[in-house]
Curated annotation (Swiss-Prot):
InterPro entries: Ribosomal_bS18 (IPR001648), Ribosomal_bS18_CS (IPR018275), Ribosomal_bS18_sf (IPR036870). GO terms for biological process: translation. This is Small ribosomal subunit protein bS18c. Belongs to the bacterial ribosomal protein bS18 family. Part of the 30S ribosomal subunit. The gene is rps18. GO terms for molecular function: small ribosomal subunit rRNA binding; structural constituent of ribosome. Keywords: Chloroplast, Plastid, Ribonucleoprotein, Ribosomal protein, RNA-binding, rRNA-binding. It comes from the Eukaryota. GO terms for cellular component: chloroplast; mitochondrial small ribosomal subunit.
Amino acid sequence: MNKSKRLFPKSKRSFRRRLPPIQSGDRIDYRNMSLISRFISEQGKILSRRVNRVTLKQQRLITIAIKQARILSLLPFINNQKQFERSESTPRTTSLRTRKK
């Protein structure tokens, strides 16, 4: 196929390669909270390997470290911060109920 006949010409745009989320010096450990917190969602769930862009071995180590941190109560199992914010923002009205005879 000739280059002039192509329907969609290839773009020559360059792309910047993303830095890996785990550097070679980083140690995946349950005590390394700054590293572990990057791989947890706002709800407290462990993010998938595709979202994290890590290797299978790194994802396994991250998962084990997060689970150990949860057991040792360094991390919460569920993050209900939004639920508490909503309940605090709504004012409670305390009214006395009167019975009608």
